[in-house]
Structure formats: C-alpha cells, structure tokens
Amino acid sequence: MRSSIYWSLIVMLCITMACSSSGKIQSWMKDVSIIPRSEWKANDPIPYLRHEPVRITVHHEGTKLLVTDDAVRKIKGIQTWGMGKDRNWADVPYHFFIAPDGKIYEGRAITTVGETNTEYDPKGHLLICCLGNLNEVEVPEAQLSSLIRMIAYCSKTYKIPYETLATHRDYSKQTTCPGKYLYNYFENGYIKQEVKKLLE
C-alpha cells in the first residue's frame, strides 16, 4: 500500500513539473510577435534553393538605424537592393529581422537558403538579422531581449539545437558582422546562457 502511494506521488510530481515547465515556455513564447511580410509590403520572392535549417546564425544589417527610425522602410529598402540587377537575389537575405525597438519582422521563408554577401555557404543556416550598425552603437536593450527570445523561439519551433548558435563572423573571415557590441554578448556566453534558461 505504501509503495503504491509512493509511486503515485512520484507520478503526480513529474506531471506537475512537466506542466510547470510547459507553462513557462508557453509564457515567453507568447511574447514573440512576428510582423508578417504583408505589413511591410514585401515583393513576391523569386523561387530559390530550398533547405532545412539545422543551425542558427546571427547577423547585423550594418547601416545606421536608430530606435526612432522607420524599420519597415529599411527592410523594404534591403529587399529592393538585394533583388536589384546588381545582385539578383531571390528576396531579402535573412529569415527574420529585429529592429532596434525590439520588433521582429518576417523575412524570407525559412525553407529557402539565405544570402550573406560573403564567402560562407548559408545552406542549413536560419539567419536572424539585427537592424543597425552594431560596430558603432551599443545594442539597444529591447533589441537584445527580442534577439534572445527569437533564438529560443526558433530553436523550439524548428527543432534546432541552441548549441548551434553562432554569428556571421564565425563562418567568414571577410566580415566583423554582427558588430563588436553584439558580438561581445556571444563571446562572453551571455546570449547562449539566456536562451538556455528560456528553454529549460
């Protein structure tokens, strides 16, 4: 009898812990709001190489953008530039954009290989881009917070291990992307630690 009660308590404890963990994950995932392509009036993409993302790679866009600036206009400009005759890309180069104010925007389809403008092959990479030049300005708190949640969201949603997290410069010798101020958070392990906390 005591044995039966003991094991019943163990089962109840496990269920409680699982529900608690699930509730925690659902709570922060509700904070991840992705603005769709339709809201920044994206042009239709050109059919391109397909892939399955198996790692997460972070970039910065590399030109000045303040919290008060128009992120939608910037993203639309990136698409026009990338799909122009000089590059002939299929779409914007990244799968997601994060503005300085923390808003997250949908980029190209995650099933489509991204672009990097450098020598590394982005096949298999899910690309998240922080708008702005993070070699020149500190990462805004809202942008950093959204980046951490977005990495965790992508890890959980697309079943990509967070341990694969890296940056553009980790794959290319031709760039300082994602900028020294953002890269500091990767070097000291802060971003990966915070992502891990969300996923636990």
What label would you give each PLM region?
Residues 49-110:
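Secreted/periplasmic proteins that engage bacterial cell-wall peptidoglycan
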Residues 1-8:
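Bacterial N-terminal signal peptides that target proteins for export
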Residues 19-61, 100-116, 121-200:
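Basic/polar, cationic surfaces and motifs that engage anionic cell-wall
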Residues 3, 66-69, 138:
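Short coil/turn segments at secondary-structure boundaries
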Residues 8-16:
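Bacterial N-terminal signal peptides
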